[in-house]
C-alpha cells in the first residue's frame, strides 16, 4: 500500500513544500548562475526513469557552458574536488545540494520521487547487470539509500547494488531513515566529492581542463583554409581558440578543441558580442582583408592590441590607401577613383593621354578579384562591369599599369618599428587578370634594389599607420623605382607567410602574430638562410576527371607539401583569380634558385585532366 499509494501522496506533499522553498532560492541563485558565464540557469538532461523510460531531469547548472564530459574508468561521471568544469557558485550549490532543488518539479510531474535510486544517463541502460536491474522498478529519487549513506564515496557498481537493495525493500520506515540521514549528510558536507586519485585518465583530462582554464583565449576571425595555420598553432600553444566563420562546415571548425562560433566575420556587433562572451585576450585574422575592420573594432571595444579603425579602412580600401600613400609621398601609380561609367571613361582617357596602359580593379576587394588590364582593342565597359561585379560599395580604381618585376614584402611591426623579414619574388599569369601562380624567397633582385624596396615598404606601413602586427606589401619595381601596388595589414596569403617565410628564415610569422595579438613579444630572430618556393598547377577550364602525378610530386627533391584545392568532379575555370587555382606544390632548397627549380619540377609532374565531354 505504501509503495503504490502513500509514497506518491508524500511526494506530492513534499513536492509542493519544495516548490515553495525553490521560488526564493531561484530568485537568489539564478542571477548568480547566469552572470557567471551568461549561460542557462537550469541544467536539463535525459535520465533513466522507472522501467527504463527516459525523462528530462532538472538541476541548477553548476558547470561552465560547453564543459566536456569526463568519465571515470567505471563509466561514472568525474566528480573530483578540484573539477575545473565547476563554477564558483556551482561548488557551493553542490556542497549544499541546492543544485538538486529543481528536481521538486520532477517530483510533482511524477517522473521522480523524493526518495529513490539516483538516476543515470541514457547510455547506462545497457550496462546494468540483470541481477541489478530490479532497481528500475522504482522511481528515481532526489535522494536515495546510496546517496544518503555513501553519497559520492562508492563506485558505480556499489551504488547499483545499494539501489537494488532499496528497490526490493521500499517501506515507510526505510524512507524516514533515508530522509533524516540525507539531512545529516548534507549538513556534515561528507563525501561531497569522490576520491579520483586512482583514476589516471580522468585526472589527466581534469589537468588538461585546468590548464585550459588558466590559458589565454584568442579569437581568430575566419576558419577557412587561410586561417587554419593560426588555429592549429594556437591550439598547439595550449591557448583557448574561438574561431568565427559564417560557414558551419569551415575546415577550421573540425580541429579538436576549437570553440565554434558561426557568425559572419564582417558582422561587427555580433563578433564583439562573441568576444565579450568568451572574455578573449586577443583577436586576429590571417591572410584575409575582409575581417580586418572587425579586428580593429573588437580591439578598440575590448582594449586589446591591434590596428586602429582608421588604419583598417586604409588597409582594406585601395582608394583610401592610395590617398594616404600619396599624401605621405610614398611612390604609387597614377590613379583615379570612380563611381560610374562616365567618371570611368574620363579616367581611362586621362591615363591613356599620359602614355600609360590602364588597369581596372575594385577598390574594396582582394585576391585578384575583378582586376583587368585594358588592351588596345578591348571594350572598356567590359572591364568596368567586371570590376563592379566584385566591388561591395561600387567604387572602382582606374590606375596606371606598372611594368616591372613584382615582389611582396613581409613585415612585422613591434612597438612602432617596422621589421622587414623577407622579400618575395612573384610570378603572375599576366594580362588580363594578373593572378599569382608562384612565389620564391628570398628575392633574387640585386642588393641595392632590395634596400630601396625595403625603404618604400616601411614608408608605406607608416603612412597607413601600422604600428603593431604584420603587413603584406606588394610592390612593382618600375624604371622609376619601386612603387606600391597595395598593402594588407595582415599576413600574406598563398602560403607566403605561413610556409615560405619559416622555410627560408626560420621565423614563424603565425606564432609572431598570435604573440602580438595577446600583447606578448614575438621572436623575429632569423634562424636560417635558405630558399623556398610555391608553384601552382597548370590547368584548363572544365570538369576535373582526375589529377595525375601527385605521388610523384610529393617524392620530388625538396618538396614539403602538395595540396589540392579543387578535386575530381569539380568544375573549374582557367585561372582568373586566386580562388580558381586547383592546387600547388611547396618546396625548399639551399638557395632561392634551387627551391624554385624543385617546386617547378614537382608541379610539372602534376596533370589536371579535364573531361572532354562532362556528360559522357
Segments and roles (model prediction):
Residues 208-311, 342, 539, 566-580, ...:
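ATP-binding N-terminal substructure of ATP-dependent carboxylate-amine bond-forming enzymes
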Residues 300-370, 375:
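A conserved helix-loop-beta module that forms one wall/lid of the active-site cleft
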Residues 371-482, 491:
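Internal nucleotide-binding/catalytic subdomain
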Amino acid at each position: 500500500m505504501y509503495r503504490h499509494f502513500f509514497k506518491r501522496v508524500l511526494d506530492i506533499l513534499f513536492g509542493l513544500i519544495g516548490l515553495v522553498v525553490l521560488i526564493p532560492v531561484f530568485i537568489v541563485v539564478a542571477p548568480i548562475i547566469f552572470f557567471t558565464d551568461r549561460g542557462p540557469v537550469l541544467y536539463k538532461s535525459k535520465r533513466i526513469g522507472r522501467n527504463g523510460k527516459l525523462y528530462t531531469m532538472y538541476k541548477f547548472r553548476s558547470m561552465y557552458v560547453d564543459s566536456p564530459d569526463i568519465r571515470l574508468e567505471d563509466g561514472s561521471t568525474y566528480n573530483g574536488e578540484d573539477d575545473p568544469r565547476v563554477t564558483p557558485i556551482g561548488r557551493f550549490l553542490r556542497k549544499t545540494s541546492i543544485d538538486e532543488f529543481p528536481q521538486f518539479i520532477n517530483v510533482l510531474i511524477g517522473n521522480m520521487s523524493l526518495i529513490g535510486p539516483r538516476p543515470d544517463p541514457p547510455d547506462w541502460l545497457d550496462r546494468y547487470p540483470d541481477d541489478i536491474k530490479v532497481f528500475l522498478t522504482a522511481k528515481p529519487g532526489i535522494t536515495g539509500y546510496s546517496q544518503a549513506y555513501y553519497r559520492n564515496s562508492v563506485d558505480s557498481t556499489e551504488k547499483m547494488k545499494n539501489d537494488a537493495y532499496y528497490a526490493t525493500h521500499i517501506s515507510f520506515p526505510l524512507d524516514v531513515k533515508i530522509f533524516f540521514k540525507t539531512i545529516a549528510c548534507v549538513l556534515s558536507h561528507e563525501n561531497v566529492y569522490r576520491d579520483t586519485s586512482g583514476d589516471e585518465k580522468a585526472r589527466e583530462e581534469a589537468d588538461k581542463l585546468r590548464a585550459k582554464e588558466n590559458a589565454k583565449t584568442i579569437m581568430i576571425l575566419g576558419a577557412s583554409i587561410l586561417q587554419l595555420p593560426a588555429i592549429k598553432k594556437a591550439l598547439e600553444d595550449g591557448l583557448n581558440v574561438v574561431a568565427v566563420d559564417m560557414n558551419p562546415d569551415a575546415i577550421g571548425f573540425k580541429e579538436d578543441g576549437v570553440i565554434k562560433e558561426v557568425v559572419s566575420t564582417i558582422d561587427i556587433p555580433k563578433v564583439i558580442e562573441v568576444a565579450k562572451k568568451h572574455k578573449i585576450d586577443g583577436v586576429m585574422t590571417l591572410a584575409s582583408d575582409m575581417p580586418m575592420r572587425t579586428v580593429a573594432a573588437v580591439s578598440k571595444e575590448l582594449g586589446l592590441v591591434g590596428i586602429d579603425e582608421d588604419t583598417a579602412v586604409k588597409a582594406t580600401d585601395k582608394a583610401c590607401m592610395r590617398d594616404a600613400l600619396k599624401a605621405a609621398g610614398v611612390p604609387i601609380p597614377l590613379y583615379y577613383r570612380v563611381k560610374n561609367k562616365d567618371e570611368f571613361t574620363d579616367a581611362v582617357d586621362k591615363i591613356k593621354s599620359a602614355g600609360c596602359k590602364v588597369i581596372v580593379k575594385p577598390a574594396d576587394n582582394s585576391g585578384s578579384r575583378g582586376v583587368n588590364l585594358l588592351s588596345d582593342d578591348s571594350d572598356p565597359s567590359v572591364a568596368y562591369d567586371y570590376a563592379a561585379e566584385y566591388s561591395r560599395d561600387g567604387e572602382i580604381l582606374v590606375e596606371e599599369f606598372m611594368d616591372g618585376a613584382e615582389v611582396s614584402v613581409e613585415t612585422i611591426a613591434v612597438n612602432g618599428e617596422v621589421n622587414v623579414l623577407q622579400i618575395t619574388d612573384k610570378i603572375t599569369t599576366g594580362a588580363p587578370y594578373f593572378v599569382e601562380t608562384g612565389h620564391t624567397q628570398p628575392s633574387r633582385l640585386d642588393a641595392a634594389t632590395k634596400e630601396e624596396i625595403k625603404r618604400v615598404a616601411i614608408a608605406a606601413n607608416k603612412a597607413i599607420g601600422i604600428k603593431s602586427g604584420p603587413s603584406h606589401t606588394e610592390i612593382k619595381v618600375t624604371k622609376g623605382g619601386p612603387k606600391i601596388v597595395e598593402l594588407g595589414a595582415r599576413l600574406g596569403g598563398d602560403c607566403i607567410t605561413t610556409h615560405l617565410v619559416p622555410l627560408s628564415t626560420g621565423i614563424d610569422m603565425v606564432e609572431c602574430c598570435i604573440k602580438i595579438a595577446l600583447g606578448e613579444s614575438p621572436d623575429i630572430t632569423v634562424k636560417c638562410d635558405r630558399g623556398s618556393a610555391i608553384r601552382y598547377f597548370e590547368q584548363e577550364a572544365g570538369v576535373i576527371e582526375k589529377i595525375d602525378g601527385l605521388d610523384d610530386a610529393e617524392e620530388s627533391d625538396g618538396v614539403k607539401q602538395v595540396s589540392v584545392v579543387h578535386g575530381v568532379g569539380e568544375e573549374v575555370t582557367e585561372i582568373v583569380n586566386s580562388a580558381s587555382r586547383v592546387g600547388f606544390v611547396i618546396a625548399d632548397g639551399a638557395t632561392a634558385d634551387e627551391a624554385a627549380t624543385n617546386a617547378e619540377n614537382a608541379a610539372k609532374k602534376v596533370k589536371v585532366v579535364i573531361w572532354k565531354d562532362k556528360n559522357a
